[in-house]
């Protein structure tokens, strides 16, 4: 174990001639640095997982919307959405959109926010003040785009952000396209399966 930040641990490992491979999970910017370190040292193998914009696709023939809502909420908001495979995009058939959103709201009302060491709480603070500001900027972006904030959207003392569901998100929106890495679920509706597949695949990320 080599504990430390990027300068103390990451960069030395990336540049060291005796290190044959580095695997990194994190931001695209840092992933590019590891490729640079490898190119400037011993051409070590670099394995990267740099971000995600995972879609949850819900068709109109779904049998149990309550179960779907539970999975969507868990996928989007577990660990405050600070998870590379978080389901941060809900792509839902227009015929069941409203019914599903109602159930998602009911699920979220059961998720209590507070001290993460308290077993009654499901939600805690974000990882850092800097990341809190990044997530808050996306909340501001939703308002700038005049999108419908269906649930949440508020920030609390410290670096807490309510789990937030934003409806009517265009595939051209930053909320649809960029990894937020926080408790913000974007909702985009579709009318047929071909449109759903196209929306799900419309991302630069591998996840």
Where are the regions a protein language model picked out?
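Short acidic-hydrophobic, aromatic-tinged amphipathic segments that line or gate anion-handling sites
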Residues: 1-4, 58, 187-191
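Glycine-rich nucleotide-phosphate-binding loops and adjacent flexible coil segments
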Residues: 183
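Short beta-strand segments
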Residues: 1-3, 23-25, 49-51
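Short, intrinsically disordered, charge-balanced linker/junction segments flanking boundaries
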Residues: 204-207
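A structured beta-alpha segment of the ubiquitous adenosine-cofactor-binding alpha/beta core
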Residues: 1-21
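Conserved N-terminal phosphate-binding loop of PLP-dependent enzymes in the Aspartate aminotransferase
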Residues: 13, 24, 73-76
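Short, solvent-exposed loop/beta-turn-alpha elements that line the ligand-binding surface or hinge
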Residues: 176
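ALDH superfamily catalytic-core signature
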Residues: 29-170, 192-194, 198-201
């Amino acid at each position: 174990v080599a504990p430390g930040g990027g300068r103390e641990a990451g960069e030395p490992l990336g540049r060291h001639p005796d290190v044959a491979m580095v695997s990194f999970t994190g931001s695209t910017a840092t992933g590019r640095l590891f490729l640079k370190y490898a190119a400037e040292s011993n051409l070590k193998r670099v394995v990267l997982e740099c971000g995600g914009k995972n879609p949850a696709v819900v068709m109109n023939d779904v049998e149990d919307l309550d179960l779907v809502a539970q999975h969507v909420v868990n996928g989007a908001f577990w660990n405050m959405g600070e998870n590379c495979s978080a389901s941060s995009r809900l792509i839902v058939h227009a015929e069941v959109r409203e019914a599903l959103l109602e159930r998602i709201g009911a699920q979220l009302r059961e998720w209590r926010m507070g001290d993460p060491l308290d077993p009654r709480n499901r939600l805690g603070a974000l990882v850092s003040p800097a990341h809190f500001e990044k997530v808050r900027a996306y909340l501001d972006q939703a308002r700038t785009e005049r999108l419908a904030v269906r649930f949440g959207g508020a920030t609390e003392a410290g670096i807490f952000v309510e789990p937030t569901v934003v409806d009517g998100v265009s595939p051209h929106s930053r909320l649809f396209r960029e990894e937020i890495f926080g408790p913000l679920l974007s909702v985009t509706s579709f009318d047929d399966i071909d449109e759903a597949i196209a929306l799900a695949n419309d991302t630069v990320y591998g996840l």
